Amino acid sequence: MALIKEFVSLWRIRFRTPKSERAVIFYSEHESYFSYFDGLIDALKSTHADPFCYVTSDINDPILTTEDPGIHAFYLHKLLPIFMQFVNCRVFVMTLTDLNNFHLRRSINPVHYVYVFHAMNSTHMAYRHGAFDHYDSILCTGPYQVRELQRDSELRTVGNRQLVEAGYSRLERIHAAWSERPDKNDDSTPRTVLIAPSWAASNVLEKHGIELVAALRSADFEVIVRPHPETNKRYPELSTGLQEAFSADAGFQLERSVRTDDSMLSADVLITDWSGIALEYAFGTERPVLYMDVPRKVHNDRYEELHIEPFEASMRGELGIVMAPEQIDRIADFVNELVNNRQRFRDQIVRLRSENVFNFGHSSEIGAQHICKLLSCDTQLQSN
């Protein structure tokens, strides 16, 4: 049945969608990635008259049932590689790395590929070597990514990529939601700690999950555990073990979905390892992070060739405190230190955000302007 739905999508996008309405195509692997596009989509709809297409590989993606006349939604999964190879549009927007490095290839047609980041991490340690080689434009989050990509181009003679000083729309959405919370400065409610690690090997949940939750609950902290979606998919036993251990504890909550940011907004402190959520949480809620000192999340063994310290590494001592796993028995002291010095950390976080994030509050407009400029240039070329 799913495959039939894919064939119908292919037919609809090729033969039933006017060329002007497939000039721009967004692609998403999973429904959760819509949160990285929504600001850009809203800004684009206000400046681009024609509808555009949104392709998802998640059959349960709510966008497939959208009634928005400005978006044509399609489902492609197994047939996606074929679609990608022959897609004919002006601009293709995606948050998936490694285009043209594996089974998803650039189109045989002259398509301009725009990359949108789904994390604020640096480009050279958490991503594979060459992950951004085959995009025409990259909407950079901050100056650190521009420096890294420029340095990478110098070392390897990568093709000419437009590095757009855009910003990070998801961060702005988190900050806007947090700013509207009436309880954001309420000290009377129980302290809440969010544990949200990465899914890499040696992550916090795998090594110290039950021990960490038990130590926090014994100190009367409310605890929310938010496993990475890849952890739920690859290591479901970790979540199951936590649920079984603390199911009778009303102060424990296991959050299996990342559809909302509610847990981030309600947490007084975030505990993580090398996950990109640390930057989103700190810069979005202006609250500190407690980092667990576990091995780095390295997907590119050559990252040191750039001689640039990854942003997520340089920020660890600035956005909070780094704690060794052997110090879990002192977890309450670390959390209380962060909470008691919240204003000092807030001032520092706001300063660092202004120094390291482009166009805070206006990134979606910048991204939409870039796409519209590409469409304008393409139209001029076609008319000549």
Predicted segment positions?
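Donor nucleotide-activated moiety binding/catalytic core segment of transferases
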Residues: 78-84, 237-279
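Catalytic donor nucleotide-activated moiety binding site of glycosyltransferases and closely related
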Residues: 55-67, 218-254
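A nucleotide-sugar donor-handling region in carbohydrate enzymes
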Residues: 2-9, 131-205, 229-232, 329, ...
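Active-site donor-nucleotide binding/catalytic segment of nucleotide-sugar enzymes
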Residues: 12-13, 18-34, 117, 122-125, ...
